[in-house]
Amino acid sequence: KRKCGLCKYRCCSGG
């Protein structure tokens, strides 16, 4: 599950 909270690119991408 990828949850985008504060980061919109690194969190979504898996960063």
From Swiss-Prot:
GO molecular function, one term: toxin activity
Post-translational changes noted in the entry: Contains 4 disulfide bonds.
Primary subcellular site in the record, as a coarse category: secreted
Domain of life (superkingdom): Eukaryota
Name recorded for this polypeptide: Peptide 2900
Family recorded in the similarity comment: Belongs to the short scorpion toxin superfamily. Potassium channel inhibitor family.
Localization, UniProt: Secreted
Swiss-Prot/TrEMBL keywords: Disulfide bond, Ion channel impairing toxin, Neurotoxin, Potassium channel impairing toxin, Secreted, Toxin, Voltage-gated potassium channel impairing toxin
Organism classification: Eukaryota, Metazoa, Ecdysozoa, Arthropoda, Chelicerata
Gene Ontology CC annotation, any one: extracellular region
Tissue specificity field: Expressed by the venom gland.
Role of this protein: May block voltage-gated potassium channels (Kv).
